[in-house]
Design a protein with these regions (language model features):
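A cross-family acyltransferase "interaction/gating" segment
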Residues: 168-231
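Generic beta-sheet signal
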Residues: 79-85, 113-115, 149-156, 189, 194
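Hydrophobic/aromatic ligand-binding patch that stacks against planar heteroaromatic rings
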Residues: 127, 143-144, 182-186
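Membrane-anchoring hydrophobic helices of lipid-metabolizing enzymes
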Residues: 4-101, 105-139, 209, 227, ...
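Short acidic, glycine/proline-rich loop/turn micro-motifs
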Residues: 125, 164-168
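Short glycine-rich anion-binding loops that position phosphate/pyrophosphate groups of nucleotides
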Residues: 88-89, 158-160
């Protein structure tokens, strides 16, 4: 079973030991285009699209992945917070599961911070943005957390997490340079660690094919057990 476990929160004050106390001033975010008509916000998120996605995803969430939560109540009911999770599975199921669970149970939108690659893919980039995807840049994260009081989800392992093969499961990859801690401190919001257990088994990667990934211009190309079972 896929199980997401919320661990005790780490507040900005607790994190001071992890990064220098004296931080450079936050750069002013570049102005964004005016929100488009309809229910699409300035980040590209559409609540109508999210509602449709939740309806379509619910059977997978409940019957296939059978997600269970512990301590979701430690996620703030209001105000900004940075959700920090481990990342796994060839096609990561953790991001949509976390976003779906919190939105359904708490009624709060979740914005997923991810690599610019997703935004650049035709069609996929638009769907990604409509469902709460935001390019993972410090200014974007700061604005979401500090100025708008939103929940932002980040996977510090990046693509290195889901690119792991099955024999490397549950071995965390380097969390970048700790930039997410600095952003949370600047924004004055709590960090909510999320431990995802079970995603590694949902779509295990047996091998990677770097040559194919390079040819397609994608971060990695996995050979999965699912491909062998259905292919």
């Amino acid at each position: 079973d896929a199980k997401g476990q919320l661990m005790p929160e780490l507040t900005a004050s607790d994190a001071k030991a992890l990064v220098p106390v004296s931080l450079p001033p936050v750069a002013e975010p570049e102005p964004l285009d005016d929100p488009r008509r309809g229910d699409v916000d300035e980040w590209g998120r559409s609540e109508r699209m999210r509602s449709l996605a939740r309806t379509l995803y619910a059977p997978l969430y409940e019957k296939w992945f059978r997600v269970e939560w512990e301590h979701m109540d430690r996620t703030p009911a209001d105000g900004g917070a940075l959700l920090v999770a481990n990342h796994a599975a060839a096609l990561p199921s953790d991001a949509p599961a976390i976003m779906h669970g919190i939105e359904v149970e708490m009624g709060r939108p979740v914005y997923g911070l991810a690599d610019h690659f997703f935004r650049s893919v035709p069609v996929v980039g638009t769907l990604w943005a409509r469902n709460g995807g935001v390019v993972a840049q410090p200014d974007n994260a700061y604005r979401l957390l500090r100025e708008q009081g939103q929940l932002a989800l980040v996977f510090p392992e990046g693509t290195k997490g889901p690119a792991k093969t099955y024999d490397e499961r549950y071995r965390l990859r380097r969390f970048g340079r700790g930039g997410f801690v600095e952003i949370a401190m600047r924004a004055g919001v709590p960090i909510i660690p999320i431990a995802v257990v079970g995603a590694e088994e949902s779509m295990p990667t047996l091998a990677r094919v770097p040559a194919v990934a390079k040819a397609l211009g994608i971060p990695y190309f996995p050979i999965t057990a699912n491909m062998l079972a259905f292919g």
